[in-house]
């Protein structure tokens, strides 16, 4: 359990004002110049030593990602913050944008300095109108106070931060599609290599990080890498904001230690499963893109990257979707299939054709008028899509179906037999 003094997002639930004055009282912008004066190498090394892994889903070392940026680039460098939070079941970044905007902006300054970027873009989901307004007000306050802009915090470093609103496309959450959209083009993922660190925004070195990943950086630098690394589990350090929704008594966002047991998280903060723990059917532990896990696994699994990977799923965004026995599990996954079909950009044939095909088969399974042989055929198609697309949307469309067949095949077959 996370100690009160170890919480990073003190105002996660908006109990206090999110303006600059209140944020400073909570410790934001506390002698930021001293952190900048320690130099780029110090910041990158400290973030590396903290063990911070990307909070957007991939779980790659944040400090390592920063170190890939060229030290002395002839081209301008950019930092891009991915605030295009569109994953079903995920709303952690939204509350950070709402109630902790100055943590994010201070993190943008420190990260920009670390990678040598004088310009930073916050790419926010188009539907987040109120959140975008909050961020813009916070940016205006920071500029007025001399915290960002020319000679930011009196450090001699110039850092401009811009807010850019997207247009509602889920695919723009993929980092290279986001860059395309930021450049004014249709949001379609790029082939890699080249990677953004060498050829990113406008063909210049670019680092893309998630909102939560950037927002925790100031606290890590103030309290030290060892403090952050002491929280959680080895290779899964620090705190994490989890979103708990679905069939729970109190849906909520909560900051807890990485590696907290899933059962404890739900019972302590979300008031337990509706109808009691024994009424649980399955949980999607990391947003809609990861495979579901049945009650038997939920009993003992911990909420961290490695434990969930071992359990055949993933931490993803930390969006926990709880489903009790009243859930039509086949229809629930079919709805996710429809979402991915709708959000496919159409660039890759396996995804463009496969997502629509999978949804149509899933709907036949929902109605029970499919053949049993189609279950294996469907699984085969998910394997053909997985790993054969430019971006991970193909994998994201395939994994929920794979999880369904792996754990609830009997229920699918029973439905086919019952309705034949």
Swiss-Prot record:
Entry binding sites for FMN: 166-213
Binding site for NAD(+): 54-63
Keywords in alphabetical order: 4Fe-4S, Flavoprotein, FMN, Iron, Iron-sulfur, Metal-binding, NAD, Quinone, Translocase
SMART domains (alphabetical): NADH_4Fe-4S
Gene3D superfamilies tied to this protein: 3.10.20.600, NADH-ubiquinone oxidoreductase 51kDa subunit, NADH-ubiquinone oxidoreductase 51kDa subunit, iron-sulphur binding domain
Catalysis performed (reactions): a quinone + NADH + 5 H(+)(in) = a quinol + NAD(+) + 4 H(+)(out)
Entries under InterPro entries matching the protein: ComplexI_51kDa_subunit, NADH-UbQ_OxRdtase_51kDa_CS, NADH-UbQ_OxRdtase_suF, Nuo51_FMN-bd, Nuo51_FMN-bd_sf, Nuop51_4Fe4S-bd, Nuop51_4Fe4S-bd_sf, SLBB_dom
Any GO MF annotation of the entry: NADH dehydrogenase (ubiquinone) activity
Cofactor: FMN; [4Fe-4S] cluster
Keyword NAD: yes
EC class (word): translocase
Binding site for [4Fe-4S] cluster: 345, 348, 351, 391
Top-level taxonomic group: Bacteria
SUPFAM superfamilies: Nqo1 FMN-binding domain-like, Nqo1 middle domain-like, Nqo1C-terminal domain-like
Cofactor binding, note field: Binds 1 FMN. Binds 1 [4Fe-4S] cluster.
Pfam families: Complex1_51K, NADH_4Fe-4S, SLBB_2
Annotated function: NDH-1 shuttles electrons from NADH, via FMN and iron-sulfur (Fe-S) centers, to quinones in the respiratory chain. Couples the redox reaction to proton translocation (for every two electrons transferred, four hydrogen ions are translocated across the cytoplasmic membrane), and thus conserves the redox energy in a proton gradient.
Name of protein: NADH-quinone oxidoreductase subunit F
